[in-house]
């Protein structure tokens, strides 16, 4: 979806070394862009060191706990879920794309420092903020509006967002 933006970012960055982190299926694109610039590419593949698994059954709001992230796909849904959790006495941090970078960072810090038990966020969660240890990532839906249509989440969407949970060296349990 964001090929042009990635190409511009990779080709336009004024740096001697560019490190691109991504899913294995983006490697071919990185090689093609680098070839256009006659730049060398060193590809390093890493394996996830902690398992990522789907839950056997849906998770209820009442079963969310400290360190959980609940992912929604609209600001309206994020705010609705936040209100429902707060009505249950839970402390909640929220992150979605329309928030300013400063507010997103502040909310991430509140969650990371334990001032909020649960994080409710859009898929902006996968875009570079440090939330600290996420116990698990729970999806409120398995489809999202992509700007043109409502579509099922792809395996890559789920891996990118869900992969924020249980990162090696970040879990106490």
Question: Which sequence ranges carry the predicted segments?
Answer:
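Conserved RecA-like helicase motor core of SF1/SF2 enzymes
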Residues: 89, 97-101, 105, 112-170
């Amino acid at each position: 979806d964001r090929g042009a933006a990635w190409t511009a970012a990779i080709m336009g960055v004024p740096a001697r070394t560019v490190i691109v982190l991504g899913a294995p299926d983006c490697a071919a694109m990185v090689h093609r862009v680098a070839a256009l610039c006659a730049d060398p590419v060193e590809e390093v593949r890493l394996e996830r060191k902690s398992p990522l698994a789907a839950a056997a059954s849906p998770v209820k709001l009442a079963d969310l706990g400290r360190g959980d992230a609940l992912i929604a796909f609209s600001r309206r849904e994020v705010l609705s879920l936040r209100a429902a959790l707060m009505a249950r006495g839970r402390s909640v941090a929220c992150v979605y794309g329309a928030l300013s970078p400063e507010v997103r960072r502040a909310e991430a810090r509140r969650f990371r420092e334990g001032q909020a038990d649960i994080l409710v966020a859009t898929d902006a969660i996968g875009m570079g903020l440090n939330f600290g240890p996420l116990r698990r990532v729970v999806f409120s839906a398995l489809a999202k509006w992509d700007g043109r249509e409502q579509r099922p989440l792809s395996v890559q969407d789920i891996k990118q967002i869900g992969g924020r949970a249980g990162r090696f060296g970040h879990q106490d349990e």
